[in-house]
Amino acid sequence: MSFLVSKPERIRRWVSEKFIVEGLRDLELFGEQPPGDTRRKANEASSESIASFSKPEMMSSFLPEGGCYELLTIIGKGFEDLMTVNLARYKPTGEYVTVRRINLEACSNEMVTFLQGELHVSKLFSHPNIVPYRATFIADNELWVVTSFMAYGSAKDLIGTHFMDGMNELAIAYILQGVLKALDYIHHMGYVHRSVKASHILISTDGKVYLSGLRSNLSMISHGQRQRAVHDFPKYSIKVLPWLSPEVLQQNLQGYDAKSDIYSVGITACELANGHVPFKDMPATQMLLEKLNGTVPCLLDTSTIPAEELTMSPSRSIANPGLNDSLAAGSLRPSNGDSPSHPYHRTFSPHFHNFVEQCLQRNPDARPNASTLLNHSFFKQIKRRASEALPELLRPVTPITNFEGSQSQDHSGIFGLVTNLEDLEVDDWEF
């Protein structure tokens, strides 16, 4: 009489059966953790380089029970409006967290399978620069995913609200170093990230850099062997098209590998430096043609913008696409003594320009891997840990709040944050 079972219960059973086959107990969705070591080694026959990675000590986990969380204000939606993102308080410790609640009843089986892959990867990965999931469980007909609240938001939030003409080079170096460390780990684990962009780079209260967007990760290991290339086109990828490499976009028999993420790092570097992503607002077909024809985005500064244009004051209503061409004539006006200086009248180091050029090589085989890039001269300027230097480099930006010492009875400070929280594109963090 299975037809009498409610849809939420059917979904719960479907998810339960599916996750048990793939290692449900490792995912701990229902809070049932048997004694002993139950962490399943995914892809057991994978390469030695994958097996050699040790698991560093990470943030402690939270209890997988809905009653342990006091949901406060809604700070975002996403996943085709099936996901609600709440600021919440974890009652046992008083820590403020982000709770992503996904309505499983409205999800298709394909969506649930998609989420299953994300949660499996979140349990498999353990790295200081990959956003940790503090708890994952099912409450009623909802999947709850709990993560720490990232008080600086994403790198996209920062350039969208404070650094609209781009960040300074040293801040970018710290951010990209954290991203490359995460990618080096992900690639050694046999995965391609496929969604590196500023909105998937989260920065915590103490200035630590985390790569998110695990939902798009794809394993390159099949039947115990690492494949030379994969051919799967990322699902729900409309938001990441400007960051995708030419070989991913063209979808041919040659496929792509982890070097496609390196191209995305180059695009993200331009995004952070210029204040907007290259190919912004360009139709998808034109974007593909530009990339296949070898159009290379660049950093906008005195070495890439003609001197005569640097004497003009650009209208902020029209952004330069960052494609190594001149600014649109309609976006310029003569500069006089009262006009502000050109926002791109700055000079990035030759090391930074070379770093971007290396990442954006049209031929993926010519791009360095993440490990090699971490030794690039661009990162020689880093002298301190990101947690020590980044908060200073992001000034005058301050974390939205650190929530320390807040009492559950007094939420006046919390609800006073709503205006600031609305500026964050939390639905695009994808945690």
Curated annotation (Swiss-Prot):
It is found in: Nucleus; Cytoplasm. Keywords: Cell cycle, Cytoplasm, Nucleus, Phosphoprotein. Pfam families: Pkinase. The keyword Plastid does not apply. The modification Phosphoserine is found at S2, S46. PROSITE patterns: PROTEIN_KINASE_DOM (PS50011). InterPro entries: Kinase-like_dom_sf, Prot_kinase_dom, STRAD_A/B-like. The modification Phosphothreonine is found at T419. GO terms for molecular function: ATP binding; kinase binding; protein kinase activator activity; protein kinase activity; protein serine/threonine kinase activator activity. Its main location: nucleus. GO terms for cellular component: cytoplasm; cytosol; intracellular protein-containing complex; nucleoplasm; nucleus; serine/threonine protein kinase complex. Residues 69-379 form the Protein kinase domain. Residues 32-52, 314-344 are annotated as: Disordered. One of its GO terms (biological process) is G1 to G0 transition. The protein kinase domain is predicted to be catalytically inactive. Component of a trimeric complex composed of STK11/LKB1, STRAD (STRADA or STRADB) and CAB39/MO25 (CAB39/MO25alpha or CAB39L/MO25beta): the complex tethers STK11/LKB1 in the cytoplasm and stimulates its catalytic activity. PANTHER family: SERINE/THREONINE-PROTEIN KINASE FRAY2, STE20-RELATED KINASE ADAPTER PROTEIN ALPHA. Belongs to the protein kinase superfamily. STE Ser/Thr protein kinase family. STE20 subfamily. Pseudokinase which, in complex with CAB39/MO25 (CAB39/MO25alpha or CAB39L/MO25beta), binds to and activates STK11/LKB1. Adopts a closed conformation typical of active protein kinases and binds STK11/LKB1 as a pseudosubstrate, promoting conformational change of STK11/LKB1 in an active conformation. This is STE20-related kinase adapter protein alpha. The lineage of its organism: Eukaryota, Metazoa, Chordata, Craniata, Vertebrata.
